[in-house]
């Protein structure tokens, strides 16, 4: 199995996936075995379900957040037992949660990628300030938070409080959108996937939704999810 594109929708493409596809295609031909192609997003969701011991959700509809460096999307997943079939319900209309975190890291002089550093810094602050992003249906914009973070840091000169401020904003927005989605589709399980889903504050604040999270080390592990999906295709 191999990731061949960011999302399983028409027109989804990034050239970086060609290297993996080329190698996997050659190996499949040499070994005389099938080649199963999936999206990067499908891999992250499957990795979360496997790591959380919830592969049973491959049989039932659920909500899934894909939170990463390039993506912040809320999905309705209607799996068929072998693959993750998803419809986008909402998410960011501009920069992703991961991009916002990395840009905040750059502002604070942190190494790239900044996820772990922002997580550690934010835990050292009790700042409760936040900028509440408005929802438009289930869509929202994170670019305004970046501007607010720059102003906040200029006013406070506190890296820890700024990191906490940004995470307060992100987590509040994700929670608001999740509540709104559950109001439309009550009773569905909520799965969190992607690298940003390893953030400790996010994991704590989402408890009200009885969430399904991957173990932190598997939040960033797309390959594990691709292996799981390949095994399911083979009936293993």
Give each language-model segment a name:
Residues 119-190, 196-213, 231-235:
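A contiguous, well-structured pocket-lining segment that forms one wall/lid of small-molecule binding clefts
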Residues 12-19, 35-43, 65-67, 94-95, ...:
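Active-site nucleophile and cofactor-binding loops and adjacent substrate-binding regions
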